[in-house]
Amino acid sequence: MINAKDSKDTFYILNKKENTPIVLIHGVGLNHKIWEPQINSFNNTVLVYDILGHGNTPLTKPQISFDDFSLQLLNLIDELK
């Protein structure tokens, strides 16, 4: 589990391999664990995370939008650079 410095996001790097990483995003009402059965099927590093207000990632404000979810993903990708 990794906590992003610039936000309260929590993400997980799994199945670490040398190939291009894959990002898996769960749906509303779920969390990163939904992907556990599929992780080992990939020959790539897999990045999974909990979207805002789900799993181990708290809400950052009372109302969130699709823009907030997009920003969250961009922040997580930046964190990996």
Stretch-by-stretch model annotation:
Residues 11, 34-37, 41, 68-75:
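Alpha-helical elements of Rossmann-like donor-binding domains used by nucleotide-donor carbohydrate transfer enzymes
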Residues 47, 51-81:
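Active-site loop/oxyanion-hole signature of alpha/beta-hydrolase fold enzymes
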